[in-house]
Amino acid sequence: MNNKSKGRTAEKIARIFLLSKGYQIIFQNYRFSRLGEIDLICCFDNILIFVEVKSRSSLLWGQPEEAVGYEKQGQLKKLANIFLYEFNEFTEYQIRFDVIAILNNNKVKCEISHLRDAF
């Protein structure tokens, strides 16, 4: 399985996880030009949440959430501003940035961590 399909699988796991917690998925893979993409955008209790999904198959390179550094955070904030400009019906919502970290080291069951208000 290549990295792109691993990422899509992780996003699917994250989407199912969030739906099971009562979140409403608004967009998946919101992309603007070459600036990048936001994995998931969802709503929960009048909060608009921009979600970055990271996964690892081992801890050799660290925890999955450690891959969301300052540069990636800045990129996500820019994309969120563009999204809010494009879809102004969400301007009254509170905004939050979450990270879903998935560790799947070839076990039947993966470990999912939901870091709310991660940055």
UniProtKB/Swiss-Prot annotation:
NCBIfam families: PRK12497.1-3, YraN family protein
Family as reported in the entry's similarity comment: Belongs to the UPF0102 family.
Name of the protein in its database record: UPF0102 protein Nther_1376
Record Pfam families: UPF0102 (PF02021)
Coiled-coil regions, chain positions: none
PANTHER family named among the record's database cross-references: UPF0102 PROTEIN YRAN
HAMAP family, per the entry: UPF0102
The species this protein was found in: Natranaerobius thermophilus (strain ATCC BAA-1301 / DSM 18059 / JW/NM-WN-LF)
Highest taxon listed in the record's lineage: Bacteria
MF terms in GO: nucleic acid binding
Gene3D superfamilies noted in UniProt: 3.40.1350.10
Alphabetical list of CDD domains matching this protein: PoNe_Nuclease (cd20736)
